[in-house]
Regions:
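C-terminal structured "cap/appendage" subdomains that terminate the fold
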Residues: 539-622
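Residue patterns forming the tRNA-binding/recognition surfaces of aminoacyl-tRNA synthetases
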Residues: 180-182, 205-214, 578, 605, ...
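A structural preference for short, hydrophobic beta-strand core positions in alpha/beta folds
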Residues: 38, 80-82, 232-233, 396, ...
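A short, contiguous, amphipathic alpha-helix enriched in charged residues
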Residues: 16-28, 378-389, 542-544
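Structured aminoacyl-transfer and RNA-binding surfaces used for tRNA recognition/handling
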Residues: 56-63, 206-507, 511-518, 524-537
């Protein structure tokens, strides 16, 4: 397993059920028009969706919390109702979407709550067993009621049975805040979310664009080395194309409404698979052309409800480095081994630890998947056998170990360890089989990353597809001259840029891998009148050596320049003053005559107060060794 440390906090479902009932009692008492629509568990507690005529905002949370406290102190008895009771049956006649709920009677009134995942749960019999309820968030959510869209209020909450559980929760929330990619993205000027541009449509700022380009450059190089061709396809596609693929019928609610052009309907594409299939079909293929590999940096659009949008994690416009491989059945194992190698290599490059590899299989509800029992059995067995061959024990590379050892020799550069890989020298990746997570067209291998907050995220995927090539009548000529249908492998090495960058920001708390930083070094002359000329020459030297450098030639005091550099989490902060200028041999930097340029610098690391002095030549040598890939 990886070395990640997560904060121990276990959600207590019994107390959250009781607290959801206490909130309903408090709301009914204080808001006569209160009408419950939904109550559901959430990652850290639960939420309720309801309607009230009054306008409710975050300003009302303190008032509602006090009323909940009165309900808890009031010691209301809670009686569990049987599902087959006449009272519950009567409610379910009009509330069919509550069929999986649990029902209770309190003071002769019937209330409902979510049914916990745990079995043999012991429900609270009185509200006074609740120690504390915290309302964490309030917002709006749209709901379709009798074919009308109505605006509901959603309150998220967490409940506790002890001070210890609340303290663990508080610790977790503080860590969540410190790792919130939205806050980090704003501080580092990575991206912008402006509702005037539209909810769920992120705007990449200059630093974010730089970061994306760094990731893109690496991926293009890797995909080229593994024999992929880059293609480019339109962001619109005909509705009939997505109807043929099945994406329209199966995921209609995740698509934007069709656009009518010249009496034909078009969709903002939600994925590139159909376009890439058309690329494959554009010319005759034989077995000699397989495997046929293509990739694309594709702009995609998928509909998400406004309540489901979360920073870069859940958006409506996204960019995916999407790739597909068309191959014979005999190619499958070789290709998957190759793609697995690409994933592990890529994650290592970006300092991401894969924690678990899932074999995602179909569930017993076979009507959700394409109907071919033999292919499903064959493909699932095939992936299972391939996974057994993978040895998921990883260790640091020789270069990374040497990098650590080199830094240890230079105590004044200890601050740079923050930008090293953080995992142990070696760890083992867990393997798991998960039913019900297959795509409708075939089984898949999902690579899972566990955040420092204990949340699982699918970071990479390899998906087998026997269906779409048939639907689009893809074919190739085999060795014996017969016509065969190829197998399609869908491959996502990092998922979307948006999700991947949100993971990077959260994982590192904004201390991105050194090689990805928009600004690795900042140079700050104390006084432009006396120190700027040397600062400019130093900047040229670092840029010549491949570093991303910023010169702060503003007229601000040095103390303010340092504060700005600290806020931007810039690792190396170089200060040019009288002493440094005096050390300069007054020769300008010339890349053709680099040896003639010489001088000293003073520098401090992010988070450090001490300043160190060194020669430019020595500092460049150390940094080149530290930052090499």
């Amino acid at each position: 397993m990886s070395s990640k440390q997560t904060i121990p906090y276990i959600v207590n479902q019994e107390v959250n059920v009781a607290a959801s009932l206490a909130i309903q009692i408090a709301m009914k008492k204080n808001y006569p028009t209160f009408k419950l629509y939904k109550v559901s568990s959430s990652e850290y507690g639960f939420y309720i969706d309801f309607y009230v005529e009054d306008k409710i905002s975050s300003n009302d949370l303190n008032k509602i919390t006090k009323e909940i406290g009165k309900v808890i102190a009031g010691g209301y008895n809670i009686d569990l109702l049987e599902k087959n009771s006449s009272e519950v049956k009567e409610i379910l006649k009009t509330k069919k979407d509550w069929s999986k709920n649990t029902f209770f009677k309190i003071n002769n009134n019937i209330f409902t709550s979510f049914t916990p995942d745990e079995k043999n749960i012991e429900y609270f019999k009185n509200t006074n067993k609740i120690k504390k309820v915290v309302l964490t968030k309030i917002g709006g959510v749209e709901y379709e009621d009798e074919k009308k869209q109505i605006q509901l209020v959603r309150i998220n909450a967490s409940a506790f049975i002890s001070d210890d559980s609340y303290n663990s929760f508080e610790e977790l929330m503080n860590e969540l805040k410190a790792r919130d990619h939205r806050t980090i993205g704003e501080e580092l000027k990575i991206f912008l979310l402006d509702e005037f541009a539209g909810k769920g449509f992120p705007i990449w700022l200059a630093n974010g664009h730089f970061l994306k380009e760094k990731i893109s450059t690496y991926l293009k190089k890797e995909f080229n080395e593994y024999g992929f061709s880059l293609v480019s396809t339109p962001i619109l596609g005909s509705k009939k194309m997505y109807t043929t693929s099945g994406h329209w019928d199966l995921y209609k609610e995740n698509n934007f409404s069709p656009i009518m052009i010249d009496n034909e309907e078009f969709l903002l594409r939600p994925m590139t698979c159909p376009h890439h299939i058309l690329v494959f079909k554009s010319s005759p293929k034989s077995y000699k052309d397989l495997p046929y590999k293509m990739a694309e940096e594709a702009k995609l659009h998928r509909y998400e409800s406004s309540g489901g949008l979360i920073g870069l994690e859940r958006v409506r416009a996204m960019e995916l480095f999407d790739s597909h491989v068309f191959c014979t059945r005999d190619n499958i194992e070789t290709i998957i081994i190759e793609l697995n190698e690409m994933i592990l290599k890529t994650m290592s490059y970006f300092n991401i630890e894969i924690d678990r590899v899932d074999l995602s299989l179909r569930s017993d509800e076979k009507n959700k998947y394409f109907d071919d029992e033999e292919i499903w059995e064959t493909s699932q067995t095939m992936l299972r056998n391939i996974l057994k061959k993978f040895n998921y024990k990883t260790k640091l590379s020789k270069e990374e170990i040497e990098r650590r050892e080199d830094l240890n020799k230079h105590t004044n550069l200890n601050f740079l360890k923050r930008w090293l890989k953080t995992e142990k020298d070696s760890y083992e990746i867990e393997k798991l089989e998960v039913e019900g997570e297959a795509a409708f067209y075939g089984p898949k291998i999902d690579y899972q990353y566990k955040t420092n907050l204990g949340k699982w995220i699918t970071i990479s995927t390899i998906q087998l597809d026997f269906l779409l090539p048939k639907k689009f009548e893809c074919e190739y000529k085999d060795k014996d001259g017969s016509t065969k249908t190829p197998v399609l492998i869908h491959f996502g090495v990092i998922g979307t840029y948006e999700r991947f960058i949100s993971v990077l920001l959260s994982k590192t708390k904004g201390f991105l891998p050194f090689k990805l930083l928009p600004t690795q070094i900042i140079i700050m002359p104390v006084n432009n009148s006396f120190h700027l000329d040397y600062a400019l020459e130093v900047k040229k030297l670092f840029e010549y050596n491949g570093f991303s450098v910023k010169l702060d030639d503003s007229n601000e005091r040095l103390s303010k320049k340092v504060r700005i550099a600290q806020k931007g989490k810039i690792p190396i902060q170089i200060i040019i003053g009288d002493k440094e200028v005096e050390s300069w041999n007054k020769k300008p930097f010339d890349k053709k005559k680099q040896e003639k340029f010489d001088g000293d610098i003073s520098f401090r690391g992010y988070g450090e107060e001490d300043t160190h002095s060194t020669s430019l030549d020595k500092f460049i040598t150390i940094l080149n060794n530290f930052s090499k890939d």
